[in-house]
Amino acid sequence: MNKNMAGILSAAAVLTMLAGCTAYDRTKDQFVQPVVKDVKKGMSRAQVAQIAGKPSSEVSMIHARGTCQTYILGQRDGKAETYFVALDDTGHVINSGYQTCAEYDTDPQAAK
């Protein structure tokens, strides 16, 4: 019985440590990825381009006015890790984060 409990606790500890890896990797991005580290709300499109370079894609948003740029930060678990920068219709940063533009540009009225 005690061996079973020890096994369960060990498995839980390993899963907890693995879950923390994503948060740690993203924290590392705050120091090494210019698009994550230096791009701030209110910056112009030209400032973002100067800091982050050319995005891998840019699309017009459907549920907001403006455009959304996607940057590829690297690979994680065989998939591209993406970071978006959303710009309003005047070309200034309104938001950014670890999503694709499609994930970010969703209908706020849609049921979840």
Swiss-Prot record:
The keyword Membrane applies. It is found in: Cell inner membrane. GO terms for cellular component: outer membrane; plasma membrane. Keywords: Cell inner membrane, Cell membrane, Lipoprotein, Membrane, Palmitate, Signal. Induction: By elevated osmotic pressure in the growth medium. A lipid is attached at residue 21 (N-palmitoyl cysteine). InterPro entries: BamE-like, BamE_dom. GO terms for biological process: response to osmotic stress. This is Osmotically-inducible putative lipoprotein OsmE.
